[in-house]
Amino acid sequence: MGRKQGESHREYKARMIDPVSDSFCGAKWYNATIWLGHGGTTSCHHPPAHQIDLEEIKTNPSAIHNTRHKKKMRDMMQKGDRPKECEYCWKIEDMEKDSDGNEPVSDRVYKTVIYEDEDLETAANLEPSFDVNLKTLEIAFNRTCQLACSYCNPAFSSTWVKDIRTNGGYQGIKSDARGHFIDDAPYAEPFDAGEFNPYVDAFWRWWPELSKELEEIRVTGGEPLMTPSIYKLFDWFKETDEPNAKNMRLAINSNLMAKGPLLNKFIDATQHIPHFHVYTSCEAIGSQAEYIRDGLDWEIWTSQFERFATEARYEGVHMMMTINALCLDTITEFWDWCLEMKRKYGHHVPGISVNILRFPSFQSPLTLPDHLRKMYHDEISDWLDAVRERGEKSELTGAELLQPWEEDQISRLIEYLDVVKTPHRNTAEQHLLHHDFKVFYEQYDSRRGFDFRKTFPRLVDWYDSIDVLDISDDHDIQAPDSVGVTNTLYAKRIVTEDGEVKVVEMKVRGRQTGESEDDYDDEKYKEEADYNPNIKRKAGSSIGWDTTVDGLGGTVDE
């Protein structure tokens, strides 16, 4: 049922959540993100992922969600104990009350309110060992993708993998300790193409039961249209006699750059899905969009967007913008294009979400010097003022062309550019961000055949003024070499049974090129104190990846 009419989120919390316990969250039972490529799972995007047990899913395919670790967390939540992996919410809830005396509302409220009261009551009283079916699921079958966006990395793009395998890791990046560009992220896809994947197999064995109760499945990647599993899912919607298929929402994150035959199959498949949503992405126009999202062709992408808007069957079309240092140069022109689409297809095609990039920090908009940030701040402010003054409405739907929630997001971006100084709490000093910005894009141009100066003429004076720093490699925790052995700082992390993310050791150790933290427990290191022969591969624990933030990584210490 969710909130009653007129009920605030605080009142909902008092009615539905607090009577269960001080730490209850419905997402631990009914929501999951699952990376089937390497077997990682988590209940929302705040806790780090943990590894699915290969032995357990042989007899219980639902264990791709109902892991022993999640059951431990459910038990804690029923008792009112706080899992430490959920510290994002606890930090919010421990903040002071506002001036009106209201306690802050954390994400666990928003992630619980979407479920029916009856389902939450069931979860509150279930034995923790009981297996539950999901209500909402985000899933990635693999990382296959034909794009290699500048701020993406090999964990999510096979084209990025090709870059690293062909050219080696990016050199000289000093500030960003997240390992985005070190190696080909072998942990993200341990199975070769065509090789049996037990996690994908478990998903399809669970699907007949899961599909009876699932309310929403969102498929991400990589690029979902490039994996056979998505067409198996499309066929299920077309052929199934499962009654819930008429109620289930299917959403796909797609870059809409699939070639003609695949796009044809995609559009045809939507005709058989009653509740379909597509989420696509862009944030600049023309050559700048093509530079940021390497592999995108602006003319093809805009044409295929319109073809989808015209021919597909859908409930929603969504534009996910990733706001980075480069897109601000033509962002208002991109919004103009979005408004033109809204005029043609309705105020909701597309719906625009503004998501500010924080990692890698040197590609954040906050890397830009003050004078450029002010220039873009003023341009965006002027654009929004003009749109508000026009007050344009859709001739098709009668609704405001730019919805209030979209205006709010753009307003937050304007404020962000004006007020916020660093992308995240661990951000390096500004001169290091500038150094990395230039070091990265010089290599990016060479590898990808681009020309930064030609593509972003308004940034050239600043770009050319950046000095590449002579910083000792002793301070470079991302210093892979294209050949031979390197000394790299490794941070070994685990997620304990109590949900605490722990860094159990940090040290410098030589490693071979292409070797990642997933090889940390290889037998050749058996003399080392932290060697564990029972843990061979860790979900998302590639060197430098901050599992406490990025939502990929860790292994359960059981």
Predicted regions: what they are:
Residues 97-135, 145-147, 168:
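Recognition helices and adjacent regulatory flanks at domain boundaries
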Residues 134-144, 155-199, 211-230, 240-262, ...:
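Core AdoMet radical
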Residues 1-42, 47-57, 100-109, 161-164, ...:
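Radical SAM enzyme [4Fe-4S]-AdoMet core and its adjacent flexible, acidic
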Residues 9-14, 66-79, 133-140:
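Short, intrinsically disordered, charge-biased short linear motifs at domain edges
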Residues 18, 46-93:
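Membrane-interface junctions of multi-pass transporters
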Residues 30-43, 127-155, 214-218:
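N-terminal pre-triad scaffold of radical SAM enzymes
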Residues 504-510, 528-558:
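Long, low-complexity, intrinsically disordered segments
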Residues 90-94, 152-158:
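Detector for the c-type heme attachment site
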